[in-house]
Amino acid sequence: MLYKRIMVTVDGSNTSILALKEAIQLAKDQKAKLRIIHVVEDLYEGDTDRDMLIAVRKAEGQKILNEMKEIARQSNADFETHLAGFTSSGRVSEQIVAEAKAWHADLIVIGTHGRHGFSHILLGSVAEGVIRLATTPVLLIRSK
């Protein structure tokens, strides 16, 4: 299958860097456009200043995107970056799928930590949520 629009989601982890590198290679091989996104999670706690928290989380997200941008730039990939909307932590996978639909992505690339058992139950899995919700093919990149 030939992909023209590949979207990769990053969170700054080593696993997301692996996903980015795989997405870059795929985009170059397929001569596809690459979109690198980071979804800003709403981790609002009742005792904190919400506006300040939003500003901090957006700045952190932009820093992650800037780091990923440098990796993509060094590879001479055709790419763009996008800081996706502020969403509750339980809805990150929904936001990723919505971003993919809005951008008309042919493929979503996402890293997975491969957790299982109790830690998977506690932490959940954004990747698993994306697989369940996406109508677009999803490529999972597992951490080494």
Kindly label every feature range from the protein language model:
Residues 1, 70-108:
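Structural beta-alpha unit
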Residues 2-50, 71-81:
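Small/aliphatic-rich secondary-structure junction motif
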Residues 19, 61-64, 126:
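Hydrophobic alpha-helical membrane-association signature
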Residues 25, 101-144:
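Gly/Ser-rich helix-loop-strand patches that form or flank binding pockets
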Residues 38, 83-85, 142:
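Residue-level recognition of beta-strand->loop/alpha-helix junctions
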Residues 38-67, 91, 95-98:
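Acidic, proline/glycine-rich short linear motifs
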Residues 42-43, 87, 116:
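Feature marks short, surface-exposed loop/turn motifs that line or immediately flank catalytic pockets
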